[in-house]
A protein has these predicted regions:
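N-terminal auxiliary segments of SAM/dcSAM-dependent transferases
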Residues: 23-100
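Short, positively charged and aromatic/hydrophobic N-terminal segments
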Residues: 15-22
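SAM-dependent Rossmann-like transferase core, predominantly class I methyltransferases
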Residues: 84-162, 167, 172-182, 303
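S-adenosylmethionine
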Residues: 164-165, 172-306
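Glycine-rich, flexible loop/turn motifs
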Residues: 63, 71, 92-96, 101, ...
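Alpha-helical elements of Rossmann-like donor-binding domains used by nucleotide-donor carbohydrate transfer enzymes
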Residues: 34, 54, 82-85, 125, ...
């Protein structure tokens, strides 16, 4: 009799939990609406929708087509909890790429965390510029230097474009280099990662290409930078030394005199407000140099040839 009662109680509890789960479970469409309602102060409606799809793929393992056809389907309590946690973190301003732990750059996946800058579309334009300008050198045994490598997205992309090149990458941050090495291992490319303070250190090699997207934001521009960027991405990778906004470009120009081969190239991403000033640093060092605009028509790159 006691055994029967126990079985009945267990069955009742099981049935009750299923009933509660059905009452309080959310549909995929309700999650979609929640993304819009909770994040509208930080993102546009289109961005909210895109974030919804990104995290549906991550949590539910569904693509956009599947999601749209299953909007009225309920999700489990565990998945509901996962979505609510993500929305809460997004509301704090944390970039979604850091929540995912990955992003895409130039068509390839890269791991990212709070120790590296999240690669920007403008930097993809820099890679495209290099690939187009130096397409005739793709099979050559080049020596390439990437200054301030961060996640390694530039150096790894170039190692894939120039498979016979010897690529070296400098960064002051050991934690950033750990992520860069993880990305290099993932893409099965060999990069010579060097931890040093580039501004005070010396170079030992002579290179065919020097490329950099260094810290170039003036500390006086801090208030212009979005909360999510300055509070969640490494400031050391964003802001130039105080009162020396062109410090990295000055050092690269100096190194181009003795550590860039004759006929070698320089490719730099720059502060759009300091295009002419940055270009001027290289006009006496390189035989050819020019200021190149990005797709938004901002002065974004300085490129040149020795």
């Amino acid at each position: 009799m006691l055994k029967i009662k126990r079985l009945s109680i267990r069955k009742f509890i099981h049935t009750f939990l299923i009933f509660v789960d059905k009452i309080f479970s959310m549909t995929i469409n309700q999650v979609k609406n929640l993304f819009s309602e909770e994040l509208q102060s930080l993102y546009t409606s289109a961005e909210c929708e895109e974030l919804f799809f990104i995290f549906c793929e991550k949590i539910l393992n569904l693509n956009k087509i599947d999601i749209r056809s299953q909007l009225e389907n309920s999700i489990s309590a565990e998945n509901q909890k996962g979505f609510l946690k993500i929305i809460s973190i997004l509301k704090e301003g944390k970039p979604y790429q850091q929540i995912l732990g990955e992003t895409y750059f130039y068509g390839n996946q890269f791991f990212v965390d709070e120790n590296v800058l999240i690669p920007r579309p403008e930097t993809e334009e820099l890679i495209e510029l290099i690939e187009n300008k130096l397409s005739h050198l793709k099979q050559e045994k080049l020596k390439i230097l990437d200054v301030g490598t961060g996640s390694g997205c530039i150096s790894i992309s170039l190692a894939k474009i120039f498979p016979n090149a010897e690529v070296s990458s400098i960064d002051i941050s050991e934690k950033a280099l750990n992520i860069a090495q993880k990305n290099a291992d993932f893409h099965k490319v060999k990069i010579n990662f060097i931890q040093k303070d580039y501004l005070t250190g010396k170079l030992d090699e002579i290179y065919d290409i020097i490329v950099s997207n260094p810290p170039y934001i003036d500390v006086l521009e801090r208030e212009e930078i979005s909360h999510s960027v300055k509070n969640f991405e490494p400031n050391i990778a964003l802001f130039a030394p105080e009162n020396r906004v062109l410090a990295f470009y000055e050092k690269i120009a100096k190194d181009s005199e003795n550590h860039l081969k004759k006929g070698g190239s320089v490719f730099l991403e720059i502060n759009q407000k300091l295009g002419k000033e940055t270009l001027q640093l290289f006009q006496d060092v390189l035989t050819k140099s020019e200021l190149v605009k990005d797709l938004s028509e901002n002065d974004r790159f300085v490129i040149g040839e020795k």
